[in-house]
Amino acid sequence: MNEFTLNAEQRSDLGKGASRRLRRLASLVPAVVYGGDKAPESISMLAKEVAKLLENDAAYSHIIELNVGGQKQNVIIKALQRHPAKGHVMHADFVRVIAGQKLTAIVPIHFLNEEAPVKKGGEISHTTTELEVTCLPKDLPEFIEVDLGALEVGDNVHLSELKAPKGVEFVALAHGTDLAIANVHAPRIVKDEAEEGEEGAAE
């Protein structure tokens, strides 16, 4: 059984007012499924099922089996609209996955060996925490690993330095953009203490 599944029903009552009623009265999340040379499909899902699925971070970059009224189709999450204060999902966009056709998806970055630069006196800043990739469905990675173990204070990592998994292409690089991924800098508190020491000496 696929670990990543969602049950849904088609909905014909559309519009912002209808979506609000779904969320308020029936604890449902409105959503749209599109792509794959088929017409967009408006659906609704139980909010508790959506929340349970998203407890697994891998769901954000994994192919999901969506069961709409008994008809199964493979999709990926394209976008989620969340409540600004409470954080729960208010609306979802899914894109159909077609075997043999490349897809574009957002994949999280997993940073490895972060303790090494910290032990050398550095602080790590994550400039980018997810990457847009394009690949065939069978090659879709759940995450991209970035090893920070060899970094020294003052070092940084750019997208061009990462090795993409087999069959995977980084969209930003394809468009000529070399994203900054992470950097190691000296702790700001050291600078502040030095300035305070200078001020004390001046007095």
Swiss-Prot record:
Q: Which residues cross the membrane?
A: none
Q: Which residues form the signal peptide?
A: none
Q: Which Pfam families match?
A: Ribosomal_L25p (PF01386), Ribosomal_TL5_C (PF14693)
Q: Name one GO molecular function term.
A: 5S rRNA binding
User: Which GO terms are recorded in the biological process aspect for this UniProt protein?
Assistant: translation
Which Gene Ontology cellular-component terms appear in the entry? Answer: cytosolic large ribosomal subunit
Q: Matching Gene3D superfamilies, A to Z?
A: Ribosomal protein L25, beta domain, Ribosomal Protein L25, Chain P
InterPro entries for this protein = Rbsml_bL25/Gln-tRNA_synth_N, Ribosomal_bL25/Gln-tRNA_synth, Ribosomal_bL25_b-dom, Ribosomal_bL25_C, Ribosomal_bL25_long, Ribosomal_L25_dom, Ribosomal_uL5_bac-type
* Keyword annotations from UniProtKB, A to Z: Ribonucleoprotein, Ribosomal protein, RNA-binding, rRNA-binding
Top-level lineage group? Bacteria
State the protein's purpose.
This is one of the proteins that binds to the 5S RNA in the ribosome where it forms part of the central protuberance.
Family per record: Belongs to the bacterial ribosomal protein bL25 family. CTC subfamily.
Q: How does it assemble?
A: Part of the 50S ribosomal subunit; part of the 5S rRNA/L5/L18/L25 subcomplex. Contacts the 5S rRNA. Binds to the 5S rRNA independently of L5 and L18.
Question: Know the name of this protein?
Answer: Large ribosomal subunit protein bL25
